């Protein structure tokens, strides 16, 4: 290559290098522009995603007894859940059909609260709401409102609206009903991209496996692990524990009288398909039991692809609620109550009306703790959902919480309250007497009677309580007036709420404000009749206040709130004094003397010879029903505390159609035996007493045999069976004619 050619090649090389440098400079400038100037914009385009947040439900806290034994707990279950975000453009109705067929094949049900039947042969539908069910009728009315229909709409009208709204006309009638029900449920649960739909709950592991096997053809259908409420001791305290359930439309959306709508539960962080406490302690302690839900975040990019799933907030389980009740003792009292009612029916109530129901409440005298609250009949918490119709149709009302909400005339159990009022106000003292000849003649034309069992002549307050002398309390009650003795009864715990954490009836004390008031009501109310009605838990609270010489504590079921992970005490219920009657002189001691002598008047009963002193007062109030003209059925009532001189427990008992209060004497002894067995460690898990000797075992066989006869102020034959006592014949309606 000559010199000229070499120069030409060099020039060309320089041009190429220059061109390459220019290109590199241009690319560099473009890169700078992309990265530095518009970098954020391009990054956003490249990472254009949307986060969807879903609630991870926290496990509900346990409810345990005083020893820490679980009564209510949460167990792991599995729900079939539809996630709309993951379903894409799938044929929803076709997918629902497939899920239904899989569930049916495994014997499962799905969420469907549409109160409409499958079509009959003529293609017509009917409502399945029970006529007598308030719950069903409310749900039916809400369904029509939700669908924009008038209340007179028929089942066919409802189905026509569903078929139109959800485009179901192409499906067979049976599938129209099935799919319509599911779509309606989706509407209730507000199914959306951010709110999953729970299609089936608590499915079996076999169903879980089946759904997973078909997962490729069921996009968006998930098996979600969930926490389900279970009652390990399902017959212990069911009325007080209450229930959990889904949030109703009425609780979710609240409209006030001014038409303003609020969503109070949503504001507290609930979702519409959450489970919530709806009654009893489950409701009262909802904030403690609920826990804190977690959050799962699903991230989807602009192409609809899920790029990330993360548990961004870990759920925290609810706190543990510890009761004041030992489940062993509760079972023992349940058993004793049932056996006492059975004994009354076998031995006494041979007539048409049987003793079929009752309640017994036991309190710790020292702080107002509830040790047992028994109802008979009762129900099984774990069977409530499946046997609700049977329970609600049962005429003996097993779902009714008699212990806290049953209102009963107290009868002569009210007399100690009148005695306290008379002594403390100075109307009488321990030496004051009233002459009893069996008839009270103060009122012209009205002469209420006394049985005079075991007494007559001049009667003092101790003797009047012992023998339940009506004439004594007629006279004292008239002189005091109901205004005065009601004020004392109220402070003792009658006719007002006891303070328990769950719903209870208030009751009523006969008052001059009553529409039927007349002066003679003051003497009837003084023996616990008239318009006075109280609850069994009020009777127990009243007995505890008498035992405490006038100091009334707030009655309560909850001992403490515990950390569910560590068991550490977060808060503890402290004894709370609600009222005090100072009690001048020996007021409460005189009442105690009278009450501790009552057991000796109940012959042929275990209570008459029990080795530990019991202070008690029976009551035999008349019911409004009669078994013959002028002859009323009777309830059996009892208040008691023991040991009489150093009280530990107080008892309130009611047995409907029980005949006479004395018939509950054996029940008091059975409760006492169970209590002392619990104290010395011989009470078994099922409520039976172990082999170790108890106080009752030291009595003779005759003393522990079921009572066969009643003397004193009760007769051996029940008036309900057709035999009439002279005093019963002459006692006007509304009086506690035969009582001890």
Residue spans for each PLM region:
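Short alpha-helix boundary/capping segments
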Residues: 87, 91, 325, 583, ...
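Amphipathic, well-packed alpha-helical segments that form the structural scaffold of globular domains
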Residues: 286, 290-293, 301-304, 334-342, ...
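Solvent-exposed, polar/charged alpha-helical surfaces in well-ordered, non-transmembrane soluble domains
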Residues: 93-101, 209, 213, 238-242, ...
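Membrane-proximal periplasmic segments of bacterial cell-envelope enzymes
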Residues: 1-314, 350-359, 710, 714
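Structural motif corresponding to the C-terminal cap of alpha-helices
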Residues: 336-348, 426, 599
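Beta-lactam-recognizing serine transpeptidase/beta-lactamase-like catalytic domain environment
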Residues: 72-73, 78, 299-316, 325, ...
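Intrinsically disordered, low-complexity repeat and linker tracts
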Residues: 681-740
């Amino acid at each position: 290559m000559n010199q000229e050619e070499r120069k030409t090649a060099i020039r060309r090389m320089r041009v190429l290098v220059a061109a390459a440098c220019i290109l590199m400079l241009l690319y560099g400038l473009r890169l700078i522009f992309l990265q530095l100037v518009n970098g954020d914009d391009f990054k956003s385009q490249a990472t254009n995603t949307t986060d969807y947040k879903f609630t991870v439900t926290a496990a509900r806290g346990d409810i345990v007894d005083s020893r820490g034994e679980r009564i209510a707990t949460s167990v792991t279950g599995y729900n079939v859940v539809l996630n709309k975000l993951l379903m894409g453009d799938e044929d929803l109705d076709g997918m629902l059909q497939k899920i239904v067929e899989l569930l049916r094949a495994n014997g499962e049900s799905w969420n469907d609260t549409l109160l409409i039947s499958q079509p009959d042969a003529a293609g017509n539908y009917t409502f399945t709401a029970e006529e007598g069910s308030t719950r069903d009728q409310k749900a039916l009315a809400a369904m029509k409102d939700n669908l924009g229909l008038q209340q007179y709409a028929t089942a066919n009208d409802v189905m026509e609206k569903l078929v139109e709204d959800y485009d179901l006309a192409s499906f067979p009638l049976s599938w129209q009903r099935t799919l319509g029900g599911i779509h309606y449920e989706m509407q209730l649960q507000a199914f959306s991209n951010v709110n999953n739909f729970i299609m089936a709950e608590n499915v079996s592991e076999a169903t879980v496996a089946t759904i997973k096997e078909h997962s490729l053809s069921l996009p968006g259908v998930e098996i979600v692990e969930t926490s389900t409420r279970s009652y390990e001791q399902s017959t212990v305290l069911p009325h007080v524990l209450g229930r959990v359930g889904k949030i109703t439309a009425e609780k979710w959306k609240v409209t006030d009288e001014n038409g303003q709508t609020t969503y109070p539960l949503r504001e507290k962080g609930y979702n519409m398909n959450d489970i919530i406490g709806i009654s009893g302690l489950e409701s009262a302690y909802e904030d403690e039991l609920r826990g804190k839900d977690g959050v799962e975040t699903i991230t989807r990019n602009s192409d609809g692809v899920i790029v990330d799933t993360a548990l961004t907030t870990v759920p925290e389980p609810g706190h543990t609620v510890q009761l004041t009740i030992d489940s062993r003792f509760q079972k023992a009292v349940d058993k004793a109550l049932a056996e006492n009612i059975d004994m009354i029916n076998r031995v006494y109530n041979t007539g048409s009306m049987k003793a079929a129901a009752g309640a017994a409440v036991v309190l710790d005298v020292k702080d107002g703790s509830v040790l047992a609250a028994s109802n008979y009949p009762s129900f099984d918490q774990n069977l409530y959902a499946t046997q609700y119709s049977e329970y609600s149709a049962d005429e003996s009302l097993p779902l009714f919480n008699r212990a806290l909400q049953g209102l009963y005339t107290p009868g002569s159990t009210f007399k100690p309250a009148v005695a306290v009022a008379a002594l403390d106000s100075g109307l009488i003292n321990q030496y004051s007497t009233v002459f009893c000849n069996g008839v009270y003649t103060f009122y012209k034309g009205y002469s209420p009677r006394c049985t005079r069992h075991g007494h007559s002549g001049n009667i003092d307050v101790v003797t009047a309580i012992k023998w339940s002398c009506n004439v004594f309390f007629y006279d004292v009650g008239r002189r005091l007036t109901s205004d005065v003795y009601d004020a004392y009864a109220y402070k003792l715990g009658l006719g007002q709420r006891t303070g328990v954490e769950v719903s209870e009836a208030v009751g009523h004390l006969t008052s001059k404000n009553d529409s039927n008031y007349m002066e003679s009501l003051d003497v009837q109310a003084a023996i616990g009749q008239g318009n006075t009605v109280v609850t069994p838990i009020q009777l127990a609270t009243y007995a505890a206040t008498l035992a405490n010489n006038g100091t009334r504590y707030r009655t309560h079921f909850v001992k403490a709130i515990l950390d569910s992970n560590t068991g550490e005490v977060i808060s503890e219920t402290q004894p709370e004094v609600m009222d005090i009657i100072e009690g001048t002189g020996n007021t409460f001691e005189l009442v105690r003397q009278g009450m501790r002598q009552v057991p000796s008047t109940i012959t042929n009963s275990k209570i008459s010879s029990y080795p530990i002193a019991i202070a008690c007062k029976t009551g035999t109030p008349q019911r409004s029903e009669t078994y013959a003209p002028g002859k009323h059925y009777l309830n059996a009532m009892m208040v008691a505390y023991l040991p009489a001189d150093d009280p530990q427990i107080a008892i309130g008992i009611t047995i409907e159609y029980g005949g006479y209060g004395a018939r509950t004497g054996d029940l008091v002894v059975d409760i006492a035996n169970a209590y002392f067995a619990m104290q010395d460690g011989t009470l078994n898990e099922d409520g039976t007493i172990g082999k170790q000797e108890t106080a009752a075992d030291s009595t003779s066989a005759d003393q522990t045999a079921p009572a066969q006869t009643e003397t004193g102020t009760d007769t051996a034959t029940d008036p309900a069976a057709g035999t009439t006592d002279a005093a019963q014949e002459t006692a006007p309606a509304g009086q506690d004619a035969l009582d001890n």
